[in-house]
Structures are given as C-alpha cells and as structure tokens.
C-alpha cells in the first residue's frame, strides 16, 4: 500500500519538527515525510528527535526549502521522489513584536513575505497537481492572532489575518476538486518562536512615545503570565494536525485550545467590534480609558460582565515563548 507523502515547511524546531517526527514514527508506518528547512545546517535537532522516536528508515527525509524563494520551492518539489505530495503543511512563519512605529520596514516586509507570500508560493507550487489528481490535503498553521487583533502584534496579526482570507477563499473553490484545506488555529506554544521574533525591546524607547513604551511593557508582563498559564507543548499541537489529516470530512478550522473561543464569539456577536476592543484593552492593560467608557455608554461598548465573558488571561501571542525581559 502506497504511503501518504507529506511535505512540511519550517521543520528546524517547534511545531514543524514535532509534527514531522510524529508522522514519521507513526505505528501505522503509513507516512513518508519530507521535512523542509531553510538552512540544512539546522537539521540536527530534527534528527535527534527522529532517533529518539525510532523513526523507521526511509520514513523521513530533509529538503532545503526557503519559502521566500520560488526557485527553492520548485527545486524541493522536484526532489520528492514519489512525484506527488498528498499532504502539504504550510508551517514556516516569522513573528514581529513591538509598537508599530518602532518596527523597521525590512522587518515588516520579511514577516509578510514569509507568512503570507511564502504560503502563496507553496500553494502555487503544489495545488495544481492536487487539483489534477482530484485529491490532496493542505494544512496551514494558523493562529488566534489571525482571528482577533492583539496589541503590539499588529504586523504579525495582519499576516495571519491575511492567511485566514486566503485559506477560506481557497476552501470554497476547492470543494469540487477533492482537495481539502484546513487551518490549525494555535494559541501559545512552547517553541523557539520568540527567538525568531524580529525587533528588540531595547530599541523601542527611541522610536516611540513614553506612554506607548509603558503600555508595551505592560503587554509583555501580561503576555508572559498568559504563556505560563496557557502554553501548549508542540507534541500536543501536532496531534491536532494529525486529527485534521485523518478526518474523513475535514473542517476549515481546528483549534488547538478552547481558551480563546469566548473572545472569538464576542467578535462574532458584535460586528461593530466595540465589545471586543474594550474587553481586550481591559484584559491586557487592566483599565478602560474614559473615552472607551463613554463610547460604551453611547451604545455598543463592553458593559459590565464583558471581562468575565472574555475570561481572564485569555489573551496571548500564538506560538510565543517567554517575552524578552525589559531593559534594565
């Protein structure tokens, strides 16, 4: 029986690494996994994990693939010896944290290129063959930051919101082609993601006003607390990917945690967005500015009990490690 061929981007660490070895070591021995990395010099941890799980010979291969480079994507596709990819996992991503005015133009461009355009490049490379064959699955690493805005994650959230629109639009089209696309919506995850977050807190004060600077460090403290309380292990998240992969009738979205669903329901229940904005501000910063309170009284803002509905500690950065320490 032919094995299911899976290609995963972003496998040097975190979710990509753990998903790759989870599939390669599956007792069914039904998967052939191509774990791709931007730099093959970083594959050591992947192979250590593969040995620890006793992945059978031939179940796992590594390929160089940089989602920022169409030629690199095409070259990786050509090195898949089976001549097809049954399951494509778009997992590579970058983060960017800080006040918007403090972010460099190159850093902003990098996040959008990797998170959005990089995913488009992968889909352009692999979807046509899936459509021709009338079968295939695409799993995209989504985020609660793609479903609700998080302060100081403006560009990161913008990139993940873009993925939501991209994937939802494609899912509508792909129904008659026999190709299923699912977003795996992650909350905080114990990974090295923060090491890849572009932007240094030490540079923030020179690029923003003192009030925003103060709010930024309020956010960092809050984020660290949420991470301690709510972060999942990548192994746990990998199981959600496996659930989506094996589902007879996959849905568009799978959530790795239910912790953020009350806030998401709040957004849906109030299309104006006022309730969510006020509740999120209160949740992160512990206060509601007078202007926001006045707006709520005028009609539609978050009233008493909105904080309880959202749930304390229900806000955090998707796939973030401990926030950087405040400069001394």
Swiss-Prot record:
Write out the GO cellular component annotations. Answer: cytoplasm; cytosol
Which top-level enzyme class is recorded in the Swiss-Prot or TrEMBL entry? oxidoreductase
Outcome (variant: residue 156 to A) = Loss of 17-beta-hydroxysteroid dehydrogenase activity
Molecular function (GO) terms for this protein are:
17-beta-hydroxysteroid dehydrogenase (NADP+) activity; catalytic activity; estradiol 17-beta-dehydrogenase [NAD(P)+] activity; estradiol binding; NADP binding; NADP+ binding; protein homodimerization activity; small molecule binding
EC number(s) stated in the UniProt entry for this protein: 1.1.1.51, 1.1.1.62
Recite the UniProt keywords alphabetically: Cytoplasm, Lipid biosynthesis, Lipid metabolism, NADP, Oxidoreductase, Phosphoprotein, Steroid biosynthesis
Name of the protein described by the UniProt record? 17-beta-hydroxysteroid dehydrogenase type 1
Organism source for this protein? Homo sapiens
Please name the gene that encodes this protein. HSD17B1
């Amino acid at each position: 029986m032919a094995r299911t061929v899976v290609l995963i981007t972003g496998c040097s660490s975190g979710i990509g690494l753990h998903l790759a070895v989870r599939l390669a070591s599956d007792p069914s021995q039904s998967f052939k996994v191509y774990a791709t990395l931007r730099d093959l010099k970083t594959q050591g941890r992947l192979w250590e994990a593969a040995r620890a799980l006793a992945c059978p010979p031939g179940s796992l291969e590594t390929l160089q693939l940089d989602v920022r480079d169409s030629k690199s994507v095409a070259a990786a596709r050509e090195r898949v010896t089976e001549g097809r990819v049954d399951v494509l996992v778009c997992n590579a991503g970058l983060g960017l944290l800080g006040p918007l005015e403090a972010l460099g133009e190159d850093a902003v461009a990098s996040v959008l290129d990797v998170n959005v355009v990089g995913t488009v490049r992968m889909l352009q490379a692999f979807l046509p063959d899936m459509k021709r064959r009338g079968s295939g699955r695409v799993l995209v690493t989504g985020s609660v930051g793609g479903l609700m805005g998080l302060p100081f994650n403006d560009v990161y959230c913008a990139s993940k919101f873009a993925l939501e629109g991209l994937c939802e639009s494609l899912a509508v089209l792909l129904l008659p082609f026999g190709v299923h696309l699912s977003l795996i919506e992650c909350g905080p995850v114990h990974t090295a993601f923060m090491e890849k977050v572009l932007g240094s807190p030490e540079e923030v004060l020179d690029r923003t006003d003192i009030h925003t600077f103060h709010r930024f460090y309020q956010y960092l403290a809050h984020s660290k607390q949420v991470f301690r309380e709510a972060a999942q292990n990548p192994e746990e998240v990998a199981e959600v990917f496996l659930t989506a992969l094996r589902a007879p009738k996959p849905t568009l979205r799978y959530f790795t945690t239910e912790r953020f669903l009350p806030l998401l329901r709040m957004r849906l229940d109030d299309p104006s967005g006022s309730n969510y904005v006020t509740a999120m501000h209160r949740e992160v910063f512990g206060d509601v500015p007078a202007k926001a309170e006045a707006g709520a009284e005028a009609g539609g803002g978050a009233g008493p009990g909105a904080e309880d509905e959202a749930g304390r500690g229900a806000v955090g950065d998707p796939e973030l490690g401990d926030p950087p320490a405040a400069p001394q």
